């Protein structure tokens, strides 16, 4: 989600009519993000092209006061929140997490045009896979928090099923569905001829340890190597902040085996090379809490995708016209079978890769930002015409789906 926010900010910064301030949290340590050697990465200096105000702190109950104080200094025209339910705190600090989710409603009540991009909703989260304790109480609190978020001027969700849930269960009138989008402008056509030379690199990338698990993939991969000796498994990304040391345990077990590569946290500038050098992206998750950033980046760099058969990912593939082959959750045999089928067929690789690349052309970051800015402009015009303030104003515009494009759906290779 942080990477997504970075790319939103980069695209907004390109607009000469926009003055952007990024309101970030005060980082003290990032021990959950380690390099290829398992060493925690060091905190970098702020990017010089951005105006960053670090005004809130993770797991702090004082974040509403901190953010409201900062907004009184900035006096923005639009306040845009990029959120998941754990943005402001973990389940070990439920008051801080809940207080943070109330901030958008408070900001709107103070008279600011407020928008939330919400990456998941709790009705679609597998609580057991996400290691949620006291599930009943957590769901009750999440329902109240959702109602608080819906007091924003508008909300964007990244899967159509999420919008349906918010409309049907909460009777929300201010919810948009928009594509997650690729993390960049119009991509360059990849050089397919380089793939598999010398290795077929199978990429798994994410924040590991909770519902994003590696056990199934590592169980499947020895069978892949029997059939495809030049296959190589590349694991990249950080641990989930509640699961330090997770991917490092696999790295220790497979130390010295050159068919396994562990990259750890990958800086944004190295992401293009990581994807471009891969043959396929695998999403071996047990469940999902939203749309998939790695799947969209696979499209951006023209890669086939193999994924656990998760309902949200099927919706994503259909709605955004992705070529994805699915395997039953936790089924290592079927995952291995699909990897062998893909890597042994250059024709199938290119067909899926080209399909995903053309899907990426229809969901670039500039296109997405234009949709957001049009929506913000409409909200501001409505606000000025209404002349009301705060939570008393009811939006006079209807929530819309983003455009969908009549591009063919992916049919599994036969």
Please state what every model-predicted region is.
Residues 273-290, 303:
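Acidic donor-binding loop of glycosyltransferase active sites
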Residues 25-29, 232-248, 264:
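Glycosyltransferase donor-sugar binding loop
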Residues 145-187:
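Donor nucleotide-sugar binding/catalytic pocket of nucleotide-sugar-dependent glycosyltransferases
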Residues 324-332, 340-346:
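Conserved acidic donor-binding segment of nucleotide-sugar-dependent glycosyltransferases
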Residues 247-272:
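Nucleotide-activated donor-binding/catalytic signature segment of Leloir-type glycosyltransferases, i.e.
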Residues 100-109, 134-154:
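Membrane-proximal helix-turn-helix segments that form the acceptor-binding/catalytic region
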Residues 348-362:
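A short, well-ordered alpha-helix in the C-terminal region of glycosyltransferases
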Residues 194-221, 234:
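Conserved donor-binding/catalytic core segment of Leloir-type glycosyltransferases
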């Amino acid at each position: 989600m942080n990477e997504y926010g970075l790319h939103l900010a980069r695209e907004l910064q390109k607009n000469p009519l926009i003055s952007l301030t990024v309101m970030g949290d005060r980082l003290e340590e990032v021990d959950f993000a380690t390099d290829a050697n398992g060493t925690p990465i060091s905190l970098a200096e702020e990017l010089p092209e951005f105006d960053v105000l670090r005004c809130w702190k993770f797991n702090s109950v004082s974040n509403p006061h901190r953010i409201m104080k900062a907004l009184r200094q900035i006096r923005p025209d639009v306040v845009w929140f990029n959120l998941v339910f754990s943005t402001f705190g973990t389940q070990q600090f439920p008051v801080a997490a809940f207080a943070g989710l109330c901030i958008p409603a408070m900001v709107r009540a103070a008279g600011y045009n407020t928008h939330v991009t919400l990456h998941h909703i709790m009705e679609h989260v597998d609580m057991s896979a996400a290691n949620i304790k006291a599930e009943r109480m957590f769901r009750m609190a999440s329902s109240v928090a959702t109602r608080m978020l819906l007091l924003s001027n508008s909300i964007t969700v990244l899967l159509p099923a999420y919008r349906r849930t918010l409309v049907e269960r909460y009777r929300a009138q201010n919810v948009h569905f928009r594509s997650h989008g690729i993390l960049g402008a119009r991509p360059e056509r990849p050089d397919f001829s380089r793939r598999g030379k010398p290795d077929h690199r199978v990429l798994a990338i994410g924040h590991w340890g909770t519902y994003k698990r590696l056990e199934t993939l590592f169980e499947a991969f020895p069978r892949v190597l029997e059939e495809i000796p030049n296959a190589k498994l590349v694991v990249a990304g950080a641990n989930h902040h509640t699961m330090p040391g997770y991917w490092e345990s696999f790295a220790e077990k497979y130390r010295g085996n050159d068919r396994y590569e562990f990259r750890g946290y990958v800086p944004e500038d190295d992401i293009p090379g990581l994807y471009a050098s891969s043959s396929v992206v695998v999403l071996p998750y047990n469940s999902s809490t939203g749309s998939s950033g790695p799947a969209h980046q696979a499209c951006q760099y023209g890669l086939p995708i193999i994924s656990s058969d998760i309902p949200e990912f099927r919706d994503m593939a259909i709605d955004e016209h992705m070529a994805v082959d699915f395997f039953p959750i936790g089924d290592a045999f079927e995952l291995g079978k699909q990897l062998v089928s893909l890597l042994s067929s250059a024709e199938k690789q290119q067909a899926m890769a080209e399909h995903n690349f053309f899907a990426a052309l229809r969901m670039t970051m500039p296109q997405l930002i234009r949709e957001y800015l049009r929506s913000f402009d409409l909200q501001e015009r409505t606000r000025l015409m209404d002349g009301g303030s705060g939570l008393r104003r009811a939006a006079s515009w209807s929530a819309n789906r983003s455009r969908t494009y009549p591009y063919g759906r992916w049919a599994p290779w036969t």
